[in-house]
A protein has these predicted regions:
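Short, Lys/Arg-enriched N-terminal segments with co-localized hydrophobic residues
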Residues: 11-29
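Aromatic-flanked redox-active Cys/Sec active sites in thiol-based oxidoreductases
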Residues: 38-39, 104, 120
Length: 192
């Protein structure tokens, strides 16, 4: 796979698709789900970021950023440069360094989806999670406590699509099962 740099971080791209992985445990079997970003379809419209803010009832204030961010990305191939957009949120890393970095144990893996979720009740606002995150994802609200994408794990538990996937008008974001990519995941229809 190609290796690219964006937002100061290293990304592995398989063709032009980018995956944020998580596992959903079902009995003894483990399914691997992903929010798949097709870079060729993303036009940086921001619908995913707005849907995320609406889903989480989050208003971005000065000095803050949304849970999902849109970045420009330069891709160099065969001595030519192309520009793509990258819709980036928490990557829900398998061995999430933010969990290890948090001295207050505010971050954890959801046992059903393996998404990195949080409860800021004990958050001391030390920014250790943000410093540990290789993608720089955790940010901090007006109260000084950590906030980030939780993968809409409550929606996923209910059989719904994550808000960003549902709202994407160009089909750039999809919820996929990496173990059975040809099989459609029976979820609610997206807005496109």
């Amino acid at each position: 796979p190609d290796v690219r740099y964006a937002c100061g971080s290293l990304f592995r791209l398989s063709g032009i698709q980018f995956h944020a992985l998580w596992n959903e445990k079902e009995g003894a079997a483990v399914k691997k789900y992903a929010i798949d970003l097709d870079l060729s379809k993303c036009v940086a419209c921001g619908a995913c970021a707005v849907a995320c803010m609406d889903q989480n009832d989050y208003e971005v204030r000065e000095g803050q950023r949304p849970y999902r961010n849109i970045f420009d990305m330069e891709l160099e191939k065969n001595n030519s440069v192309s520009y793509n957009r990258l819709s980036l949120a928490c990557m829900h890393c398998e061995d999430a360094p933010c969990i290890t970095g948090c001295p207050s144990a505010c971050l954890r893996k959801d046992p059903e989806t393996n998404l990195t979720v949080y409860d800021t009740t004990n958050c001391i606002g030390c920014h250790s999670c943000a410093m540990a995150c290789p993608y720089g994802i955790p940010s901090f609200g007006e109260n000084g406590k950590m906030i980030k994408c939780d993968g809409c794990y409550v929606r996923v538990h209910r059989g719904l699509l994550p808000a960003c996937v549902k709202a994407c008008p160009f089909g750039a974001l999809k919820l996929v099962d990496l173990e059975a990519p040809e099989k459609q995941i029976p979820k609610e229809p997206s807005l496109r």
